[in-house]
Amino acid sequence: STYGISQQLLMVGLVLILFALAFKMSAVPFHFWTPDVYTGAPTVITAFMATIVKIGAIVGFYRLFSVVISFYTTYNIILLVISTLTIVLGNVIAATQSNTKRMLAYSSIGHAGFIILGITVLSPSTTYVTWYYLLAYTLSSLAAFWVFYLVSEQAEQEEEISIFKGLVK
């Protein structure tokens, strides 16, 4: 018993917090909402969700689990499985999409897996690399959504990936 809280109750609380943060980061198996919401929301809101909301969840995840992982190695194994599944599923499904926003959504899921993996390993060098990766992900996502917004304003089929044909000539 720590501070009058049983060990089992503490574990249940940590699992529930993990689930909530995994949902906000769009990690497998809590990723199902992301493609539908990204597709249905205006591009500016989608860019906000893909960057700012995800950063908030990742910072919360890091703050909590940088302490917890050192005490509970079971969480480390669970997070390695979650991050691996998130990377594979996000990137494989992203490669099959014809809708640009859905592709960006699944790509965002894959990137979340890489970030979770960096936090899970949690050594001093991976911490810096993870924050650098998060910065690079944020800037590239903002650029991708900005280009999508500019191109889709001129296109008839505004969300299909075919609108980018001839963009680099």
Label for each model-derived stretch:
Residues 1-169:
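Alpha-helical transmembrane segments of multi-pass membrane proteins predominantly involved
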